[in-house]
Amino acid sequence: APTKTFNIAGMQTAAVAVPNPVIRHKVWRALNTDEVAEPNAFAVDVAVAAFTKGGNWLDELRSYIKENKTTVIEYIKEQIPQLKVVPSDATYLLWLDCRGLGSSASQAAERIREATGLYLSAGEQYGKGGEGFLRMNIACPRARVLEGLERLKKGVEILCSDVQK
């Protein structure tokens, strides 16, 4: 689907490619049963335009997000040593190892949110193996990333002082 890649979620467009004819028929039936098989009036044109004319924009976006990622990694390494950024290849969602904070990821996310207004997702909500990790979205303007990092630093300082009490 072009929706996340090109930031056109409001168009509610996606494509399904199913090579196996038996499975394709089952998918087709399910989509039609749920009445989600018909695109809105703009969806097809928007999707085609995104895929055929959005290459340069997407390259610039990837570069910008990569710079955001570098900014986050350097900031956390220098300013918030209690956290570690999990290495990743390609995503605008970063996983932060918060096992050094002395509380669960859920508790950390909640306390940081209460103290600073910064919303991070606790890894537990994504299944087994997510315990001890926070998820951070960096697909936003750099100023917002920097503001989020300042809030994160403040939240971690507060959380660490709470744990020491």
Where are these regions (language model features)?
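PLP-dependent class I/II
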Residues: 1-165
